[in-house]
Amino acid sequence: MTNSNRIKLTWISFLSYALTGALVIVTGMVMGNIADYFNLPVSSMSNTFTFLNAGILISIFLNAWLMEIVPLKTQLRFGFLLMVLAVAGLMFSHSLALFSTAMFILGVVSGITMSIGTFLITQMYEGRQRGSRLLFTDSFFSMAGMIFPMIAAFLLARSIEWYWVYACIGLVYVAIFILTFGCEFPALGKHAPKTDAPVEKEKWGIGVLFLSVAALCYILGQLGFISWVPEYAKGLGMSLNDAGTLVSNFWMSYMVGMWAFSFILRFFDLQRILTVLAGLAAILMYVFNTGTPAHMAWSILALGFFSSAIYTTIITLGSQQTKVPSPKLVNFVLTCGTIGTMLTFVVTGPIVEHSGPQAALLTANGLYAVVFVMCFLLGFVSRHRQHNTLTSH
């Protein structure tokens, strides 16, 4: 593979994460305006965004098999067509059914693109370099999560219709579409070059189960925590502005942490540092949940920084459980994480209703403790060390 081709594929991976981050995180900014547009209360409007999450989940799950049937370049180009149709649907429709359909299509497109982006990184880079590259790729999710809400605020403050926010997000996919030209993608399944040697099917092993549970619990814990921090902070007498600043600080620190760990991870065994980070994150979340408002700002900054590398390292270790990176395995771990996203309000909503926001934060803390236990147990069964040794010879 030529260096320029590798750079193009790497940028497609970066932008695939930026696309998903923009779509998921911008929701809170535009929900009120969309509710006004359809003359609906915000509470019933929020349910339609489940179609976005459902699209992401279904496409990540199915793409484990689709990748071996439909070439990656074809998928990305077809995704561009779907993106144009979805944004056009948002712009020219006043029907809630069509809005929900467009949201589902956007979810499908971003899920397919993100799973391709993840697979490209696991295919092109080996060992510890794979971990640091995946981490840097994941930082584009957070970066888009910071940039696009600012773009949305700028447009909405000038009374520009909400659907132009999605048109701006569509520009990310225009860049991906342009990068597919003159770019060679890895061939999979029936499109892969034929070899005389029989294809050896590798068993995944119990380590994949530990990593999948860790991925689900981590995302469910993280989103369950950050979704209820503002309500919890307001209950302690903080202003809405200060409560919002806590969330912003978390994501800012999370992004800085990703950049720092994309360098730091190269010097450590991934399973060991993952266990340390998961334990630290569980302790820091407990400090936040039981501390005074005066210490909240510092503890959430520390939590954002030290938890930033956990999810990506889980995916990296998953990809290293087999000798050759398996798209089905990587997508399975990703799917478990996405299920965590889907369950966020299903799990935390009733807890808050019965016991208040702090109970939801303590539940999230318990989930982080489960992540620590899974990472610790992984140390006894993980195959990443033997596969790293093989690839380094």
UniProtKB/Swiss-Prot annotation:
Entry-linked CDD domains: MFS_FucP_MFSD4_like
GO molecular function: transmembrane transporter activity
Lineage: superkingdom: Bacteria
SUPFAM superfamilies: MFS general substrate transporter
Coiled coil ranges: none
Record's keyword terms, sorted: Cell inner membrane, Cell membrane, Membrane, Transmembrane, Transmembrane helix
Short name of any one Pfam family annotated for the protein: MFS_1
Keyword RNA-binding included in the entry's annotation: no
One annotated Gene Ontology cellular component of this protein: plasma membrane
Family assignment from sequence similarity: Belongs to the major facilitator superfamily. TsgA family.
HAMAP family assigned: MFS_TsgA
UniProt name for this protein: Protein TsgA
Organism: Shigella sonnei (strain Ss046)
